[in-house]
């Protein structure tokens, strides 16, 4: 792969398509803790990460799997679960003494109304100061699960409200 004296091999994580170092550099320059949102098909994970010279240090991790403890028994990969995970993360983040952060979505697409921004809305609603634009948040009917109820007939809204009250209460 590295042939010729003028060729420079990119960093391994850049070659694998896992890290955008230009964005990472800008996030670290802010000197704020990063609120890292990662989504899969079945789960949402949010982490509080601080950059140090030895390497990044993870202070807090919240997964949407934890919502089962708060009475949310539906899918943990949808928009209501992302919001509740963000809300739970925000409460735990404030309990640790961190009241601000900066959003790190990694290589996820920057789509208005996505699960990433539903999680961010949960973090912001918990009282954490994260720079954002309100236009990127999904509308309240999607966050509460009314769209899922209309589509599948499963009542997500009541469990969403109960879990939200349990997290905030």
UniProtKB/Swiss-Prot annotation:
GO terms for molecular function: 5S rRNA binding; structural constituent of ribosome. The keyword Ribonucleoprotein applies. Keywords: Ribonucleoprotein, Ribosomal protein, RNA-binding, rRNA-binding. Pfam families: Ribosomal_L5e (PF17144). GO terms for biological process: ribosomal large subunit assembly; translation. GO terms for cellular component: cytosolic large ribosomal subunit. Belongs to the universal ribosomal protein uL18 family. NCBIfam families: PRK08569.1 (NF006342). This is one of the proteins that bind and probably mediate the attachment of the 5S RNA into the large ribosomal subunit, where it forms part of the central protuberance. Part of the 50S ribosomal subunit. Contacts the 5S and 23S rRNAs. This is Large ribosomal subunit protein uL18. It comes from Methanothrix thermoacetophila (strain DSM 6194 / JCM 14653 / NBRC 101360 / PT). The lineage of its organism: Archaea, Methanobacteriati, Methanobacteriota, Stenosarchaea group, Methanomicrobia. The gene is rpl18.
């Amino acid at each position: 792969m590295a042939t010729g004296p003028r060729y420079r091999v990119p960093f391994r994580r850049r070659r694998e398509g896992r890290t955008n170092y230009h964005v990472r550099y800008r996030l670290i320059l802010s000197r704020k803790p990063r609120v890292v949102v990662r989504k899969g098909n079945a789960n949402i994970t949010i982490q509080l990460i601080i950059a140090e010279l030895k390497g990044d240090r993870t202070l807090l991790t919240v997964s949407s799997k934890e919502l089962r403890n708060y009475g949310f028994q539906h899918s943990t990969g949808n928009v209501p679960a992302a919001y509740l995970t963000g809300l739970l993360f925000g409460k735990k983040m404030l309990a640790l003494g961190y009241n601000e952060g900066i959003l790190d979505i990694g290589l996820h697409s920057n789509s208005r109304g996505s699960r990433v921004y539903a999680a961010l809305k949960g973090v912001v609603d918990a009282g954490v100061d994260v720079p954002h634009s309100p236009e990127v948040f999904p509308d309240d009917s999607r966050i509460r699960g009314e769209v899922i109820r209309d589509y599948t007939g499963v009542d997500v809204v009541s469990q969403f409200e109960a879990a939200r009250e349990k997290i905030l209460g």
